[in-house]
Amino acid sequence: MVLIRVLANLLILQLSYAQKSSELVVGGDECNINEHRSLVAIFNSTGFFCSGTLINQEWVVTAAHCDSNNFKMKFGAHSQKVLNEDEQIRNPKEKFICPNKKNNEVLDKDIMLIKLDSSVSNSEHIAPLSLPSSPPSVGSVCRIMGWGSITPTKVTYPDVPYCANINLLDDAECKPGYPELLPEYRTLCAGIVQGGKDTCGGDSGGPLICNGQFHGIVSYGAHPCGQSLKPGIYTTVFDYNDWIKSIIAGNTAATCPP
């Protein structure tokens, strides 16, 4: 079974496949408190349901399937029970999803750009992550992180974000596990071929960080999480660099690559 990585307590459309319910990092360890300064917690009145990535003081990138009404974003958070002094909360001022996205295909252009209602300040626990300067290389060791489930079957949400290292894999290693993947979906495949480390329910929208740059957005994967031969699927940020930069520059009519 394949699942979109959004919180399990949210309504998930019954499709032939679904995106990961806000998944937690399976097979990881508690993140160092200062290593996830760009990680954004997205929540509403029912609680946390997705993550995002701060790319500058006014903009956040997440997955399009994380779009929801009346959500807020928390910056600088670590423990959900103990506040950091520099935590900041913002509302979305504007949201941008690719105008040429095929709405009936959950994997197509799974990216959303959010303008904040006011800028956030850099601090000990808050800093933006750089957009990629070039495509990532197969074999790269990449970092995943999030407050998603840390167990693959029974949902177990941690108080703090978990992090893990995984490998960027060749598309050919993903195709057998995900025959529905098409080249036009512009995705990356990352994980451990033998399984054991993966994003999971609650991690949707969070970053895949390779060589210190923001290369992927948690989008899609298998359920249970962490299966062998079924790594996670991530939206390729590099392919949307021009769209992101155009929107930020004020060209709100910009379209995404086909």
Swiss-Prot record:
GO terms for biological process: proteolysis. Keywords: Disulfide bond, Glycoprotein, Hemostasis impairing toxin, Hydrolase, Protease, Secreted, Serine protease, Signal, Toxin, Zymogen. Residues 19-24 form a propeptide. Its EC number is 3.4.21.-. Residues 1-18 form the signal peptide. Its main location: secreted. InterPro entries: Peptidase_S1_PA, Peptidase_S1_PA_chymotrypsin, Peptidase_S1A, Trypsin_dom, TRYPSIN_HIS, TRYPSIN_SER. The keyword Aminoacyl-tRNA synthetase does not apply. Pfam families: Trypsin. The active site is at 65 (charge relay system), 110 (charge relay system), 204 (charge relay system). It is found in: Secreted. GO terms for molecular function: serine-type endopeptidase activity; toxin activity. GO terms for cellular component: extracellular region; secretory granule. Disulfide bonds join 31-163, 50-66, 98-256, 142-210, 174-189, 200-225. Residues 25-249 form the Peptidase S1 domain. Expressed by the venom gland. Glycans are attached at residue 44. Belongs to the peptidase S1 family. Snake venom subfamily. Snake venom serine protease that may act in the hemostasis system of the prey. Monomer. This is Snake venom serine protease 1. It comes from Craspedocephalus gramineus. The gene is TLG1.
